[in-house]
Amino acid sequence: MNETVAKTKYSADSIQALEGMEHVRKRPSMYIGDIGSRGLHHLVYEVVDNSIDEALAGHCDVISVIINEDNSITTKDNGRGIPVGIHKKEGVSALEVVMTKIGAGGKFDKDSYKVSGGLHGVGVSCVNALSESLKATIYRDGSIWEQEYERGKPKYQVREIGKTKEKGTEVTFKPDPEIFKQILEYDYEILSSRMRELSFLNKGVKISIEDKRKKDRNGNYKKEIFKSKEGLKEFVSYLDKTRESIIKDVISMQGEKNGIPVEIAMVYNSSFLENLHSFVNNINTHEGGTHLSGFRRGMTATLKKYAESSGMLDKLKFEISGDDFREGLTAIVSVKVAEPQFEGQTKTKLGNREVSAAVSQAVSEMLEKDRKSTRLNSSHRC
């Protein structure tokens, strides 16, 4: 819980419904990318993203994911719990609004969430629409509340079923075979990889994943628990664990530039391959975008300026390029953007122009500071 806690109230009226979800089932690929393996696993990410949003807001530090025997998924967190009070505009419980209205959620109310992930906000309602069944259990204000759905439609009104000292949200859903006709079985390794990734991106948050479909020879289910103390520095070390590092420590920075939180970690190894990863609000932007272009530009300009001023390029007979500086580089760039603009429904490329300048400035300052500590000198290949 190392992010600034939102001071304003997170209540039923924080939930804003933007539009219906009638055509989600007719055109699911518009919302989750495809109806194959990628889309199937994306359902899990959407639900977990809600828990991560609670972590970003400073209200959650434990998240669990369980693959059940029937290939349904259960996620649970210790956040505030989705509000269950009556939504003034919709006239039903805010929980039902969140679960049945596309684009409904506290993430659209910036008093509740400063930044958030999720697939363009379609989130858990999209998961609900594409599930044969879904059950939401809310632990909030001393009570336990629940509601079940069938292919996105409530089976009954939100009801109180008991008392509790816990707080948080639990969701169990089973993907609909009418939608996912080719694949319904979850791949543990795919989900595990994403949970590990999220733990690095959100240091201090404990994320567990358990597979209850099969026991090992000792009668135990496969389970992993991820929790990172150093965040991206640890992430880079994990990615580079099989490579020989040519600088002593991972170079890193964390700060805010032009109102945009930026975190960068990088290291050089003895290979000649470039290994760059970029994230926006915990979303893996596989196709990069303005944050990655800003990183490349800032890095190239700073290192080239240093190399020229130190005379390292005097004897070169060719023009050095950014590619030369990125040989053997493993780096991660992570930014938090209040209003991210993505190219494509599946969030693979960031389009915000202002992010490029922020990241470029951040990496320039980081490298200038590290140059003075002389750690970068040992990585020079010119």
Residue ranges: model-predicted function:
Residues 2-13, 71-94, 105-230, 235-238:
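GHKL-type ATPase core
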Residues 171, 322-375:
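Extended, well-ordered alpha-helical scaffold/bundle regions in very large, multi-domain proteins
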Residues 376-382:
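Single conserved hydrophobic/aromatic residue that forms the stacking wall/gate
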